[in-house]
Amino acid sequence: MIDCKIIRVFPRRTAWTPESPLVFIGDPPLFRPPEMPVKISVTFTWDIPEGQRLQRAWEQYYSDVQIGGPAFGDPGNDFTPGRFIKEGVTFTSRGCPNNCPWCFVPEREGKIRELEITNGWIVQDNNLLACSNYHIRKVFEMLMAQNKAVTFSGGLEARRLKSWHIELFKKIKVPELWFACDTPASLKYLKRANDLLGDFPTRKKRCYVMIGYKENLASAERRLKNVYALGFLPFSQLYQPKTKRIKYSQEWRDLNRHWSRPALYREKPRTKGE
């Protein structure tokens, strides 16, 4: 159950921001709730200065104002649905057993940790398929009871995909399955995943493709084309480090724009079902 007696403040509104009379974006309003704890949640490191400014602003009216969130290395020890993220989102695990050099999840959250399963239909786990078989099956039992279309927005690791996972996917409503291909070495696992997903149309097979990490423009474009050729819809994302943001050239931005919009790169109209 959501603790209704906490004011939650965010530096900016995103698609994940919860809706509540006690959720605020930015400075304290003219008409404010009565005295209660205030928690300022900062997701991105570049928003830390704004979060700290907001802490000072809210401290003018409330005695207990705390600041935290992913930007401050919060390991996510527990998860309360709807408190700091919108209704429907659930985390059933934290962390990741991989050690990808561009990813801050293992440093912040540690290795994979299974949490108590809470209801939801937007699964935001960083690496659900790295969990135990028992946990994965229990997650799908929960999802089957939701009677809603399920999104695995945290992504699925192609290397860990197995045939019995596919059977579980077929038991729920899945508009799309999200994978990732952040290096050329990942392509072989994506090909194997595509073979396992033979009954799923192209429009349901989607792939985050991080570009710009220790590679040139030609290499990034080649990987994007390969992902598409394997039967997935690539969605390009420019790499950004944890702290200082990279200012990419127009060429990089154009490449990213083209390959993050299927309407721009799809070569021809697909047949029905694709």
Language model segments and positions:
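N-terminal pre-triad scaffold of radical SAM enzymes
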Residues: 1-12, 80-109, 118-125, 129-130
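Short loop/helix-cap segments at secondary-structure boundaries that form the rim of catalytic
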Residues: 16-19, 29-35, 71-80, 113-119
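A structural motif corresponding to the C-terminal lobe/cap of the Radical SAM core domain
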Residues: 171, 176-178, 185-274
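A short, structured N-terminal alpha-helical element that caps or precedes a catalytic domain
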Residues: 1-64
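Core AdoMet radical
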Residues: 8, 39-45, 104-193, 203-213, ...
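Short, acidic/polar
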Residues: 23-30, 161-169, 190, 217-223
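Short beta-strand elements of ligand-binding domains
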Residues: 61-75
